[in-house]
Amino acid sequence: MAEGGASKGGGEEPGKLPEPAEEESQVLRGTGHCKWFNVRMGFGFISMINREGSPLDIPVDVFVHQSKLFMEGFRSLKEGEPVEFTFKKSSKGLESIRVTGPGGSPCLGSERRPKGKTLQKRKPKGDRCYNCGGLDHHAKECSLPPQPKKCHYCQSIMHMVANCPHKNVAQPPASSQGRQEAESQPCTSTLPREVGGGHGCTSPPFPQEARAEISERSGRSPQEASSTKSSIAPEEQSKKGPSVQKRKKT
């Protein structure tokens, strides 16, 4: 029993010894160029065209993570950038171990940067403390005690921005401007209210010569025209509808 157990244990040990040798033999060298690289996610693929000094007929994709890149600063690869690398075979496929530029130089990297990091930065323009008005901090970081409310336009504590006299003088409302212009312009109508249609303007007295000219065109004298108009006016006011038309015909 003891011998069998020893022999069984001795059988497992020889099987475990070759594993490090197999891992070491899997580390290979290759050259190629960056196929694509996602700067936000931090990974991409290398298109390997040469393996252990022998060219490949068909390029092979090798996974690359930014932690494997040999360079300073923000680590990334530019599409089409030539690289040299060591890689191994894993359960997921070929993975790079160390990636450098040609001749072991640092990688160049991509000019692109993640958009999320730039959006997170606060823009200093327009930021100010709502407590004291300072530009170098915000209200939650203000060292002064709570200050009284004041007008945001002229910084006065006597009124709020809605009642600021300086703002109202500087920017008069458009409606008041239009109303003032309409009131300032005199009525330019030269026709009397009877002829012009009642614009609400006081027209100058109608000259006698113009009345005579109008009556001559209509074939009546000024007296007849005025008398006819005065006789028809009360009848039109007292009667409506078809009766008015009958009166005009007769």
From Swiss-Prot:
Disulfide-linked positions: none
Residue ranges with Polar residues bias: 173-191, 220-231
Expression induction: Might be negatively regulated by the microRNA let-7b.
Nucleolar localization signal (motif): residue ranges: 239-250
Bias kind Basic residues: ranges: 114-125
Region listing for Disordered, in residue ranges: 1-26, 98-126, 169-250
GO molecular function: mRNA binding; RNA binding; sequence-specific double-stranded DNA binding; zinc ion binding
Tissues expressing the protein: Expressed at high levels in the placenta and, at mucher lower, in testis and fetal liver. Isoform 1 is only detected in placenta and in moderately and poorly differentiated hepatocellular carcinoma cells (at protein level). Isoform 2 is detected in fetal liver, non-tumor liver tissues, as well as well-differentiated tumor tissues (at protein level). Tends to be up-regulated in triple-negative (ER-,PR-,HER2-) breast tumors, as well as in liver, ovarian, and thyroid carcinomas.
Modified residues (Phosphoserine): S54, S96, S105, S110, S203
Coiled-coil blocks: none
Family (UniProt): Belongs to the lin-28 family.
This protein's name: Protein lin-28 homolog B
Organism: Homo sapiens
Taxonomic placement: Eukaryota, Metazoa, Chordata, Craniata, Vertebrata
